[in-house]
């Protein structure tokens, strides 16, 4: 029975007596919520009466379930009633009405007079004036599709077809009629319309009597900027308004329409909503009461109940709802009679003010096959799933043709049906379907399905004087005007047509928006086979069609076609004979046949003729010959395309339609453009200015080549051989190609031969390689034979140059691109959206794409283009070396559009995607990189800016052949001269290529870590390699050791040949940890065997068989085993290539390798196994010790021999082996390995990655041997952890971080043992676990990764035994609990637990009985406390979670009062009543928190600080507010880590004061207001004195000079008192930046620059640097450049350059930083600081070689006196950032030249102490104290030596240094005595 009672929603409709009705009505007015209580008690009494009422009870139960089903029925028109308030969405906007989408697929309409009273008044005023008003705008400007609106059903009109039209009203007076001025509260969300514009804001009509609403301008600015596009609000504009303040006495309401405030608005109990006043669109917090298949019942605002039907569940959470679940819901409608409230859980409704996404109507009317059923809901209907994944819905009456044929079993989930989309419901985000056969087979469903010119069938509905109405479907009506009932006018149409007759019509006009359809029944038009003209673009000259005369005038006839297209037949075209009076011959409505003479679509003008042209196919032969005489060779004419053939186009020569043929090759001068034009030309297209080449009996041969047309027009067309003489240059085309030469024909028909010998300046192997048939060429006549009518021609470029090659090149390029643009125009006329989109795409356009597939050749295919089906491709080169995966989002730039293959070539290159805005100059010479190649032109990108430019690959019509060596390649560098500075319609700049000598080699995209880049060449190897040698493999040679390096030894052989011995070829058995090269000494004679050689240029190790071995550096071996070897068995292994050799190494194999260096950037050790085999040891594979991983350079020495295990080829390059020093080559169960944290998932665990390419997961049960709720907070991404592999059975490893696993030898204490299965548990065992969830059956506690226990309700807490106890508030997921195992069920794997104190020995999990009110507090009524206890419990839980997260929480801290709203700005602080003082212990806790907050702030900056301050402010609100507002204790403005000017503005972190709301919550205010009326006179006097004291205290605070600035006015006062203090100005800027007010921060900076005195140069520079920082972070590159240029003008340029370089570096804009440093090196080449900073920059980026080159350049540019300092600086940098060995070499070289530079010695000593060993440090001290220096300097070094030994040495070492100093003093004294 309890369940039955819950099923009754609020507001039932059971029958009641009149007295009972009256009683309920009075109760509702007093306390609406007592009804449910009385009903429950009544029902309980009935139950208690005993078995006598059992039968009646069953009936009641059945009725109640039926009642629930009725309530869950979806809305229909019958369930609506007048006055019902409902939420809707604007679907369509027309001039006079709005179409509103309502829930459950309903639709209503709002008339233009139902917007608001002010708008209606404006309309009436406009009608009265008969002139449009300026301040009155139409509905399309006030409303847009997708807007959510609150409506009221104003009327339900019934049409003739018994269909109801739902008429709605948006007028606030109707919508908000249920509210009164007294019920308005701050925080309420209302809707209103703008009624007028005032000086300081807007008056808003909210429709509440007795209340006036005002919207201040500042509260509307955000909305105006974001939603209104900067325009002011208009009268009638619909707004979602939040009440900010209510002034009760005058009824004035202050509103806000800010997006953040409105979207966060939520209805609360404090706002005193009732069922009568509840408005649609309100967002409420609700609790799920019951879950049914049809939907949910919710409880909200404590007392109200509501329904959520299946359409309005959250699609992502459907099926997961459970009882007592807390959700947020939106009110959809409230029925005024039944009081039923319907709600929605869809996320889109939970943010008020957010518009709904507009559904695409492309498929509207589409018939779909095999659509599967997703769910069947009985009488409500069924849902279906479409192919694209979207949901669709069909009502019950649309599931079958009739009720009799309906079969419910046919709609089981998964069954498929044929259906048709009939509409879209935006409110439900669903497509509406119908399965009715009549609808599926209907020709048209909606007006937009009907196209002008289409044939349609319909039934006569009515016959009226103005025409006949025809019905063509359920929704479609059309009109046949009286004029169109027949070919001639009929007087009595009712005699010919009858109601119900089926008629066949042709559509004249269809306007879907206006639902206007006009048709014709004229037989000639209906049965016409001629093409119909439906738009002006269809009207091609020569087209014949039917139309009807609209008007007859003196000047001719106006003929109308379809879709309001009309044209004029001039008087002289009415007939072949003169027509004196057109009105006597023609009449209106007459059907006529016309031919199009001319049409201008842009002007909508068309010229027609009744004098029909003859069809050439039907002409007689004699007439045809007669017309052909009208065309002669050399004549220009327009042609119309008739048909396409294999080789060209069949055309008709206009105006006489003479048949002709236009070959494909003759469409263009450019060979590639001919097929392109042929492909896109269509039948009916007209080509202008076509040249007639020849006229024969069969056909007329035509040509469209612009070069030939220009030659004919220019008179360069000799018609006979007598007009031709040697030396003439003629333009023709290749007619035929033979082995011996090429025949060229000219426009007049003459032809000549170009022999092979003079065909080209280049050697001609095959004539067909140089020319193709139909190609346009320029020929020079070399010989003429008039008798034989022959001539010889030359096609060589040197003979046929027409002028400047550069000009010709540009002309050819322009012509080629212009023709391609013409092709785009042809494409844009096609119906296909794909082709139209391709036509609009031009090079240089940026696209946001998604990677679809990476092909085997390295190229990439993309999806997510502008239209589906578009092929977008990036070549391997244009991947720019990026690692891509399917689904990855990328930004790309279009390079070229292939209009034949319908492909778009794009590039991901960084320089192209991030194009720079720089002004270009015409004629400037620029470097460019070739990005794309076509046959006739190339597309290149300018190096400086990234702009795309096109340049011709040919400089002449004959210039078509290139040898392979001359051909350009993608990536090759070229020099271009710009001819245009702005890209035209083609999207490309035009340019001319410079000399070919300026071309550079192709820029290959290669891996940043290749063998070539890593190869470091020993300078000793470069010397002496010029000589050839006669050595061969196996020869034994002798030599002298020249130098010793860590991994190799350089040896000088006979005849000065240099050889090399690798560390692996010195000893047979190398002890681990030793350096083999140390065995050899400089000058020692060695005997070695030649085993290979290194190339002189590349220094790569070459195999034996290499042909250039005689010019290599011999590779030697001194290993005893190889020296004793007589044969070549050992040596033959060196003949294998390195890559093949690497493949021979097997994973798990142990090798000896030699450390070359530690790569700090890539975090690996680089080692050499052999001269040609190198490897990498990732840092995580070097050791299991965290100490070693932290400082690997201290553990491993360069040149040291290491034993390593082969893992496999390196991931980044197959030229390297991946090695490991910790043993295993693959991860398996039981292994311990080092990994790196990739992700930390709260309440779940960690994800860890390994160098082996594997990934593993660590459960929260395996993080530590002792559980903690916060132990996951100790981990951050990229942190190194030691892991134990528990399982490797799946691709994702199972790991453990427990010390008992990773360090078993430590024998650490195990507080919480591992629980992997139920077998690990025993009954009575005490253990700890984490709360997983709270279920109706009890609390689920996780005991291990796969073991979960259940604590049933009686075993959870001793305070409450109810099953419905809200434990989830007190036992959140992840909470750590101690439990006792009560029972184990091994068969069902069930574990029963107890959490009770007597079982666990711990405190009760619930500190107090649930539902018990907290202790009564001062100044509060008990009622308010009880009512708000639940809300406070939530706030307390949130606060505890925040304290846990930030690490600042303390036990016993007072939770804050329930906040009404989070303030948006830190400065927004209201003064109000002061709270009661708190206890001293709470104050101490607050002080601790404040100190912690201040400490944590020092290590952070920027935006993060801003948000942290927001959190701290919330926490500080827990402190006594008296303390917070005391000015003496207000926190001061703080700067993190000192004041450094070259850091970002975000490090300036003003410690803004906490912005807690000083007034109490609304719950506290109500009782105080109630008691305020009852105060005595004495109390009022005391209150007045108290208020005066508070006011004086505030005034004192404002006068305090040390007061913390809280607003812009405060900062203005400060900068007024100290105008030249940059610190204050920067704090002012930071204040604005933290509020994201970028423009205001800029304005402050500009004020500072104007205000600060010109004498304060440093202060001004500080502001300039801050402004640069601001523009770098928030501005564009252009704005940053402008500020930088200004800063350089007003400050010392070098300082500004250096600051900007640092800004770029710190913001990781390394490319910009590099470019800036290059500019600085050119401008400040005499400044050593620039060179040193650039060197440091490169070293930090890992570019050591580049840094070395910079040092060499610095020494060339700087004066000699600076050299030593620069060298020392670079050496210092090498020690710190680069190779320590190289740094030592630089210092040693410098000190050998300048041995008395004590400053260099001092720096060298510092570096050795810091980066070297103690042995090295003592060695250098020994050297320096034996130098011959001045005694004063020697004293300095002795003192340093002594200090060093005191710190690092023993007492013996200290005494030794003292003895040496004494010895030095005695020696000096004896010398002075002598």
Curated annotation (Swiss-Prot):
The modification N-acetylalanine is found at residue 2. The keyword Phosphoprotein applies. InterPro entries: HAT, NA-bd_OB-fold, Rrp5, Rrp5_S1_rpt_hs11_sc8, Rrp5_S1_rpt_hs1_sc1, S1_domain, Suf, TPR-like_helical_dom_sf. Residues 1417-1433, 1578-1589 have a biased composition (Basic and acidic residues). It comes from the Eukaryota. Residues 43-55, 1434-1447 have a biased composition (Basic residues). There is a cross-link at residue 1416 (Glycyl lysine isopeptide (Lys-Gly) (interchain with G-Cter in SUMO2)). GO terms for biological process: rRNA processing. Its main location: nucleus. It holds the Pfam family S1. HAT repeats lie at residues 1602-1634, 1708-1740, 1778-1810, 1812-1847. It is found in: Nucleus, Nucleolus. One of its GO terms (cellular component) is small-subunit processome. Coiled coil: none annotated. The keyword Cell wall biogenesis/degradation does not apply. Residues 83-171, 187-258, 281-346, 365-436, 453-522, 542-611, 634-705, 727-796, 844-909, 1034-1107, 1148-1222, 1230-1298, 1324-1396 form the S1 motif domain. Interacts with NF-kappa-B p50/NFKB1 and NF-kappa-B p65/RELA. Essential for the generation of mature 18S rRNA, specifically necessary for cleavages at sites A0, 1 and 2 of the 47S precursor. Directly interacts with U3 snoRNA. This is Protein RRP5 homolog. It comes from Bos taurus.
């Amino acid at each position: 029975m309890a369940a039955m009672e819950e099923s009754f929603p609020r507001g039932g409709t059971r029958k009641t007596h009149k007295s009972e009705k009256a009683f309920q009505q009075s109760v509702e007015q007093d306390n609406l919520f007592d009804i449910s209580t009385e009903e429950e008690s009544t029902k309980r009494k009935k139950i208690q009466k005993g078995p006598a009422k059992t039968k009646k009870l069953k009936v009641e139960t059945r009725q109640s379930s039926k009642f629930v089903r009725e309530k869950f029925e979806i809305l229909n028109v019958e369930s609506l009633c007048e006055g019902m308030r409902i939420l809707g969405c604007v679907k369509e906007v027309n001039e006079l009405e709005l179409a509103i989408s309502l829930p459950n697929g309903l639709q209503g309409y709002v008339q233009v007079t139902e917007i608001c009273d002010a708008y209606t008044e404006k309309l009436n005023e406009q009608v009265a004036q008969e002139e449009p008003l300026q301040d009155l705008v139409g509905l399309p400007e006030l409303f847009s599709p997708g807007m959510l609106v609150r409506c009221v059903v104003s009327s339900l009109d019934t049409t003739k077809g018994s269909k109801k039209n739902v008429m709605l009203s948006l007028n606030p007076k109707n919508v908000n009629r249920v509210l009164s001025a007294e019920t308005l509260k701050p925080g309420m969300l209302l809707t209103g319309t703008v009624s007028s514009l005032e000086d300081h804001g807007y008056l808003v009509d909210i429709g509440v009597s007795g209340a006036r609403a005002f919207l201040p301008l500042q509260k509307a600015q955000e909305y105006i900027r974001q939603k209104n596009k900067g325009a002011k609000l208009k009268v009638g504009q619909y707004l979602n308004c939040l009440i900010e303040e209510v002034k009760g006495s005058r009824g004035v309401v202050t509103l806000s329409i800010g997006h953040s405030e409105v979207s966060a608005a939520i209805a609360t109990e404090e706002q005193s909503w009732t069922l009568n006043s509840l408005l649609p669109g309100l967002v409420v917090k609700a609790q799920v009461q019951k879950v049914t298949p049809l939907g949910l019942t919710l409880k909200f605002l404590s007392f109200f109940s509501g329904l959520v039907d299946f359409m309005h569940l959250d699609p992502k959470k459907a099926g997961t709802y459970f009882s007592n679940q807390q959700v947020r819901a939106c009110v959809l409608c409230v029925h005024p009679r039944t009081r039923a409230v319907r709600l929605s859980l869809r996320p889109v409704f939970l943010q008020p003010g957010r518009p709904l996404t507009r559904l695409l109507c492309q498929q509207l009317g589409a018939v779909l096959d095999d659509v599967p059923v997703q769910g069947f809901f009985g009488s409500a209907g069924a849902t279906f799933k479409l192919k694209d994944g979207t949901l669709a819905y069909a009502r019950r009456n649309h599931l079958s043709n009739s009720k009799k044929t309906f079969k419910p079993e046919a709609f089981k989930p998964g069954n498929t049906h044929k259906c048709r989309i009939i509409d879209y419901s935006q409110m439900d985000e669903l497509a509406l379907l119908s399965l009715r056969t009549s609808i599926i087979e209907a020709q048209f469903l909606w007006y937009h399905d009907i196209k002008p010119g289409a044939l349609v069938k319909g039934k006569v509905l009515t016959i009226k004087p103005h025409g006949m109405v025809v019905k063509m479907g359920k929704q479609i009506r059309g009109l046949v005007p009286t004029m169109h009932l027949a070919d001639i006018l009929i007087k009595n149409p009712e005699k010919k047509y009858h109601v119900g007759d089926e008629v066949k019509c042709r559509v004249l006009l269809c306007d879907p928006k206006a639902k206007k359809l006009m048709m014709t029944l004229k037989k000639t038009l209906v049965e016409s086979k001629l093409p119909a003209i439906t738009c002006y673009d269809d009207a091609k000259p020569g087209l014949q069609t039917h139309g009807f005369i609209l008007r007859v005038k003196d000047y001719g006839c106006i003929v109308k076609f379809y879709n309001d297209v009309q044209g004029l037949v001039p008087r002289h075209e009415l007939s072949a004979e003169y027509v004196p009076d057109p009105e006597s011959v023609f009449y209106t409505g007459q059907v006529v046949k016309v031919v199009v003479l001319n049409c201008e679509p842009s002007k909508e003008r068309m010229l027609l003729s009744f004098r029909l042209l003859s069809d050439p196919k039907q002409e007689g032969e004699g007439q045809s010959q007669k017309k052909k005489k009208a065309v002669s060779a050399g004549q220009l004419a327009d042609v119309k395309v008739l048909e396409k053939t294999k080789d060209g186009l069949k055309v008709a020569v206009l105006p006489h339609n003479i048949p002709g043929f236009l070959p494909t090759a003759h469409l263009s001068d450019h060979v590639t453009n001919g097929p392109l034009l042929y492909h896109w030309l269509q039948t009916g297209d007209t080509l202008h200015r076509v040249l007639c080449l020849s006229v024969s009996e069969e056909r007329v041969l035509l040509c469209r080549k612009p070069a030939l047309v220009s030659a004919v027009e220019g008179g360069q067309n000799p018609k006979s051989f007598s007009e031709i003489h040697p030396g003439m240059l003629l333009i023709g085309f290749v007619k035929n190609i033979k082995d011996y030469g090429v025949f060229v024909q000219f426009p007049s028909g003459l032809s000549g031969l170009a022999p092979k010998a003079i065909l080209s300046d280049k050697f001609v192997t095959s004539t067909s390689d140089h020319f193709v048939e139909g190609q346009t060429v320029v020929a020079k006549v070399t010989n003429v034979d008039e008798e034989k009518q022959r001539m010889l021609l030359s096609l060589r470029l040197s003979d046929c140059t027409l002028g400047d090659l550069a000009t010709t090149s540009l002309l050819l390029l322009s012509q080629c691109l212009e023709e391609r643009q013409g092709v785009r125009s042809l494409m844009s006329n096609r119906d296909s959206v794909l082709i139209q989109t391709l036509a609009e795409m031009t090079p240089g356009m940026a696209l946001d794409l998604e990677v679809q597939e990476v092909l085997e050749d390295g190229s990439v295919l993309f999806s997510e283009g502008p239209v589906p089906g578009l092929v977008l491709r990036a070549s391997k080169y244009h991947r720019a070396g990026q690692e891509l995966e399917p689904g990855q989002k990328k930004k790309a730039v279009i390079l070229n559009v292939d209009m034949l293959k319908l492909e778009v070539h794009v590039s991901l290159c960084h320089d192209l995607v991030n194009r720079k805005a720089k002004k270009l100059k015409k004629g400037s010479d620029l470097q460019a990189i070739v990005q794309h190649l076509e046959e006739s032109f190339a597309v290149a990108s300018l190096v400086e800016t990234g702009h795309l430019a096109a340049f011709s690959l040919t400089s002449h019509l004959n210039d078509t052949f290139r040898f392979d060596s001359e051909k350009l390649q993608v990536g090759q560098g070229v020099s271009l001269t710009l001819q245009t500075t702005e890209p035209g319609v083609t999207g490309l700049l035009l340019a001319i290529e410079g000399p070919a000598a300026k071309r550079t080699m192709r820029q290959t995209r290669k891996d940043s870590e290749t063998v070539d880049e890593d190869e470091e060449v020993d300078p000793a190897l470069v010397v002496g390699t010029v000589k050839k040698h006669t050595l061969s493999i196996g020869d034994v040679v002798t030599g002298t050791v020249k130098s010793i390096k860590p991994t190799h030894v350089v040896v000088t052989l006979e005849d000065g040949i240099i050889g090399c011995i690798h560390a692996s070829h010195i000893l047979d058995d190398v002890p681990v940890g030793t350096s083999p090269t140390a065995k050899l000494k400089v000058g020692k004679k060695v005997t070695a065997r030649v085993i290979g050689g290194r190339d002189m240029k590349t220094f790569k190790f070459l195999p034996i068989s290499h042909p250039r071995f005689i010019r290599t550096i011999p590779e030697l071996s001194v290993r005893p085993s190889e020296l004793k070897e007589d044969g070549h068995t050992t040596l033959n292994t060196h003949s294998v290539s390195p890559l093949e050799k690497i493949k021979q190494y097997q994973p798990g194999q142990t090798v000896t390798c030699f450390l070359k260096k530690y790569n700090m950037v890539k975090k690996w050790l680089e080692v050499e196994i052999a001269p040609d085999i190198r490897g990498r040891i990732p840092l995580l594979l070097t050791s299991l010790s965290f100490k070693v991983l932290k400082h690997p350079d201290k553990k491993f020495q360069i040149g040291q021999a290491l034993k390593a295990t082969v893992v496999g080829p390196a991931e980044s390059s197959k030229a390297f082996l991946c090695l490991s020093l910790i043993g295993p080559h693959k991860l398996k169960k039981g292994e311990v390995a080092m990994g790196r944290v990739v992700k930390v998932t709260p309440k779940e665990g960690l994800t860890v990655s390994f160098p082996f390419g594997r990934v593993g997961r660590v459960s929260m049960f395996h993080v530590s041997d002792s559980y903690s709720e916060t132990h996951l907070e100790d981990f951050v991404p990229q942190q190194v952890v030691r892991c134990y592999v528990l399982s490797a059975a799946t691709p994702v490893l199972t790991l453990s971080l427990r010390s008992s696993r990773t360090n078993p030898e430590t024998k650490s204490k195990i507080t919480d043992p591992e629980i992997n299965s139920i077998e690990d548990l025993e009954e009575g065992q005490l253990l700890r676990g984490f709360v997983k969830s709270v279920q109706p059956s009890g609390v689920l506690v996780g005991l291990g990764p796969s073991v979960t226990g259940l604590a049933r309700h009686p075993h959870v807490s001793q305070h409450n035994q109810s099953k419905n106890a809200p434990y989830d508030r007190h036992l959140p997921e992840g909470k750590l609990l101690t439990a006792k195992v009560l029972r184990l069920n091994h068969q069902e794997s069930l574990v029963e637990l107890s959490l009770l104190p007597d079982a666990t020995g711990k405190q009760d999990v619930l500190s107090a009985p649930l539902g018990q009110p907290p202790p009564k507090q001062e100044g509060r009524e008990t009622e308010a406390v009880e009512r708000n206890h639940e809300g406070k419990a939530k706030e307390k839980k949130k606060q505890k979670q925040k304290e846990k997260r930030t690490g600042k929480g303390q036990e016993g801290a007072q939770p804050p009062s329930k906040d009404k709203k989070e303030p948006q700005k830190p400065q927004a602080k209201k003064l109000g009543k002061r709270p009661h003082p708190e206890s001293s212990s709470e104050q101490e806790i607050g002080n601790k928190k404040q100190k912690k907050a201040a400490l944590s702030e020092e290590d952070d900056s920027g935006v993060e600080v801003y948000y942290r301050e927001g959190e701290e402010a919330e926490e500080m609100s827990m402190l006594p507010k008296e303390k917070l507002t005391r000015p003496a204790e207000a926190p001061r403005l703080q700067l993190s880590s000192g004041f450094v000017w070259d850091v970002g503005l975000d490090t300036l972190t003003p410690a803004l004061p906490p912005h807690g709301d000083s007034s109490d919550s609304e719950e506290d205010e109500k009782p105080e207001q109630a008691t305020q009326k009852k105060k005595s006179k004495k109390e009022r006097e005391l209150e007045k004195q108290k208020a005066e004291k508070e006011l004086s205290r505030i005034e004192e605070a404002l006068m305090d000079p040390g007061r913390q600035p809280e607003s812009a006015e405060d900062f203005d006062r400060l900068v007024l008192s100290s105008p030249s203090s940059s610190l204050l100005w920067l704090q002012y800027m930071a204040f604005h930046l933290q509020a994201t007010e970028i423009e205001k921060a800029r304005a402050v900076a500009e004020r500072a620059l104007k205000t600060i005195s010109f004498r304060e140069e440093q202060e001004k520079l500080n502001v300039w640097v801050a402004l640069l920082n601001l523009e770098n972070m928030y501005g564009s590159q252009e704005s940053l450049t402008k500020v930088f240029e200004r800063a350089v003008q007003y400050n010392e340029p070098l300082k500004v350059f250096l600051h900007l370089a640092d800004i770029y570096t710190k913001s990781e804009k390394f490319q910009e930083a590099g470019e800036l440093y290059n500019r600085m090196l050119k401008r400040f080449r005499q400044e050593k600081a620039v060179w040193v900073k650039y060197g440091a920059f490169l070293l930090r980026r890992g570019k050591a070689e580049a840094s070395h080159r910079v040092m060499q350049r610095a020494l060339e540019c700087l004066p000699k006196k600076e050299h030593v300092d620069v060298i020392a600086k670079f050496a210092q940098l090498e020690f710190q950032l680069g190779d320590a060995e190289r740094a030592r070499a630089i210092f040693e070289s410098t000190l050998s030249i300048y041995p008395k530079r004590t400053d260099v010695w001092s720096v060298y000593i510092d570096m050795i102490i810091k980066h070297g060993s103690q042995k090295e440090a003592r060695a250098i001290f020994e050297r320096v104290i034996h130098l011959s220096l001045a005694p004063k300097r020697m004293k300095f070094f002795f003192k340093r030596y002594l200090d060093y030994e005191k710190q690092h040495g023993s007492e013996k070492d200290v005494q030794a240094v003292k003895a040496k100093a004494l010895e030095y003093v005695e020696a000096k004294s004896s010398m002075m005595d002598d």
